[in-house]
């Protein structure tokens, strides 16, 4: 299709999850509730880590940054999705759509790197406890956190750069609830044979590298745990890892489905459902996953609650 024969697109229309008026009301209330829980849960984690002395450790520092990333991730998508339930077929200027994609990819990629850093932290704590203060010094922790955000920005610029190189001169209705790369690619009147592959290679490379770090870390952790003679020691070591493993499984399972698997292997409806899970649901679940099974967090929350009401 030749761009010169069509009017250039100035805004995109998000079709959202549904056009049924009754479902729109139900979804609005439901997802507004999820968003509020997401904000309250993650802000609580950040405040607890900053205010409680017993949580001033690398593990909880990473957890506080994960909470911040989850807030950014959810906020990049949910408010616009909620508007879509009130005003059907939400219109977004092209630059706003590009900015949303950039934000989603930045926070999503940063989460990958933070989860890998948290796995390495658990590896050092369990396999080399005597060297923990050296290997996980404040400088190294800040370096890992900084690298996570930089990695997120670099990957986001890969996606955004590819999007900026495309021309849109025909249909402008995105069959999605946010400006994801794959639905936008379908609307382009440019040759997408190469542009469509680059983001998948970039995202796939990050997933492979971070999964490798997580896998190797947990292989060594498992070997170390199996060598422990104390049943109590094994239980304690396992309990410090189960929350992280749960978060990793949920998150990587969904993003691998979207960004690595061939687009022909799933439908647009499946894409929306899985995208909804990793952009909206998982940011709400993470604070619950890490707090419900963590004695330190529960104790810090109890003390903070007592301080408020005393």
From Swiss-Prot:
GO terms for cellular component: membrane; plasma membrane. It is found in: Cell membrane. Keywords: Cell membrane, Disulfide bond, G-protein coupled receptor, Glycoprotein, Membrane, Olfaction, Receptor, Sensory transduction, Transducer, Transmembrane, Transmembrane helix. SUPFAM superfamilies: Family A G protein-coupled receptor-like. The chain crosses the membrane at residues 26-46, 55-75, 100-120, 134-154, 197-217, 238-258, 272-292. This is Olfactory receptor 5P1. Residues 47-54, 121-133, 218-237, 293-310 are cytoplasmic. It is a multi-pass membrane protein. The gene is Or5p1. Glycans are attached at residue 5. Its main location: membrane. Residues 1-25, 76-99, 155-196, 259-271 are extracellular. It comes from the Eukaryota. Potential odorant receptor. Belongs to the G-protein coupled receptor 1 family. InterPro entries: GPCR_Rhodpsn, GPCR_Rhodpsn_7TM, Olfact_rcpt. Disulfide bonds join 97-189. GO terms for molecular function: G protein-coupled receptor activity; olfactory receptor activity. GO terms for biological process: G protein-coupled receptor signaling pathway; sensory perception of smell. The keyword Kinase does not apply. It holds the Pfam family 7tm_4.
């Amino acid at each position: 299709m030749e761009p010169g024969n069509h009017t250039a697109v100035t805004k995109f229309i998000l079709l959202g999850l549904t056009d049924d008026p009754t479902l729109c009301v139900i979804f609005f209330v439901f997802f507004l509730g999820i968003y509020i829980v997401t904000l309250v849960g993650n802000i609580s984690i950040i405040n607890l880590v900053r205010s409680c002395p017993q949580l001033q450790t690398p593990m909880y520092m990473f957890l506080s940054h994960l909470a911040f990333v989850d807030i950014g991730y959810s906020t990049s998508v949910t408010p616009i999705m909620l508007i879509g339930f009130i005003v059907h077929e939400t219109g977004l200027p092209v630059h706003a759509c590009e900015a949303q994609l950039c934000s989603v990819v930045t926070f999503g990629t940063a989460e990958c790197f933070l989860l890998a850093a948290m796995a390495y932290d658990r590896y050092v704590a369990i396999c080399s406890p005597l060297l923990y203060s050296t290997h996980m010094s404040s400088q190294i922790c800040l370096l890992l956190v900084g690298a996570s955000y930089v990695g997120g920005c670099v990957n986001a610029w890969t996606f955004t750069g590819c999007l900026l190189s495309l021309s849109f001169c025909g249909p402008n209705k995105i069959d999605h609830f946010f400006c994801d790369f794959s639905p936008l690619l379908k609307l382009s009147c440019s040759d997408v044979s190469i542009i469509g592959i680059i983001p998948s290679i970039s995202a796939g490379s990050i997933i492979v590298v971070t999964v490798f770090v997580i896998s190797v870390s947990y292989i060594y952790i498992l070997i170390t745990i199996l060598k422990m003679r104390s049943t109590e020691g094994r239980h304690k070591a396992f309990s410090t890892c189960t929350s992280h493993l749960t978060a990793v499984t949920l998150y990587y399972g969904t993003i691998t489905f979207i960004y690595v698997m061939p687009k022909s292997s799933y439908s647009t409806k499946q894409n929306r459902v899985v995208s909804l899970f990793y952009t909206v649901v998982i940011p709400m679940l993470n604070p619950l996953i890490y707090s419900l099974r963590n004695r330190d967090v529960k104790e810090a929350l109890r003390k903070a609650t007592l301080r408020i009401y005393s």
